[in-house]
């Protein structure tokens, strides 16, 4: 018996927009439509809906207002909003109030709408299965990887550029546009960017929209790998070379007819550089300890954190390999250049972490988002992910506040250029001793107040100050509550 199609609710006050969306989705979904929020609520009270796609601008109640109520009453429903407006205020409201899964901007393409709806339906099913399985795993005390976890990984790996979250005006938009151009051309591509900037995710997205998408995708990071181990991982080893006498198939052969992403290519030894060049030129590889060559037909995407062109000029990287790797070259911006994306990324990471750890969380408060957006994130996406997970672990409420943020982030006051200043930068900055001490004092005051939820009595006691003395320092440095005023709280 065939499974029933997932139910999707389309909400828009314009009949022609509803008709266009229904036409794009009706082959894959059981489509329900509503002309406005009230009609949609009535449908939700009667029907089981997995996905909602809602227009932002509607008379009466906006899409954000409607989806906020949906999150409270039907939190498992995956919510997508369509908007023609890209101002950050609207986006922040949608992220925090409605807990949306994805933005779509007008004009949307039917294939884009269908792809987003399919992904949302899969995520709905996956979340429900994961919740059920988490309960079973606790009872069984099992540490083995679950079937649902495998399916979730396959789902994420199976999606293309839609997995790369960003706002419409993101600095990431240009890199993604270039990646889309190169994806369908079977040429090597070099992704330049700092560690944690999303190079592997972009490489995976390129693979899954390429002509090789039905073939395997493998990745390896050469940074820190000894030459012999890197050679074995990439090209394999003949029987008798490794302990135990077993042969090993390298990633280059496993990725035959698929895609291989090699990060940290700047760390490749001269011998490994030569082997990579040979593989690119002739498709030939030689396993460690072997005499005969094997062949592979793969698409190579590489990632580099260093400037390979400069390394070529210094004689530390082969010029012929650099030019072979960089038929297409894409520069990825660091997270500090994507401040407008931080809230969206953090919300998505929080939702994933909440499901993974079985702990409910609805989002961040305004003060927490302000700190997260103003921090420099030298560790890029990895650091943000770890910080969000840490906040979730210590959270006592469904809405995560700024007091949960690590001290070094709370103390990192933005500089005039917008970048955060580390303690070392403050110590070596221009100015007198008094100026530098004042900078450090401002950071300590700001962090202590935030951690104590702006209770000045507790903050003053912790700092060994009177409330009058604390107030004098706040006035002197112009330190205010993130909401725009210093919040008064009664003493304990």
Curated annotation (Swiss-Prot):
CDD domains: AAA, REC_HupR
Cross-referenced PROSITE patterns: RESPONSE_REGULATORY, SIGMA54_INTERACT_3, SIGMA54_INTERACT_4
Family annotation (InterPro entries): CheY-like_superfamily, Homeodomain-like_sf, HTH_Fis, P-loop_NTPase, Sig_transdc_resp-reg_receiver, Sigma_54_int, Sigma_54_int_dom_CS
Binding of ATP, residues: 193-200, 255-264
Cellular compartments annotated: Cytoplasm
Domain (Sigma-54 factor interaction) ranges: 164-393
Protein name per the record: Hydrogenase transcriptional regulatory protein HupR1
Lineage of source species: Bacteria, Pseudomonadati, Pseudomonadota, Alphaproteobacteria, Rhodobacterales
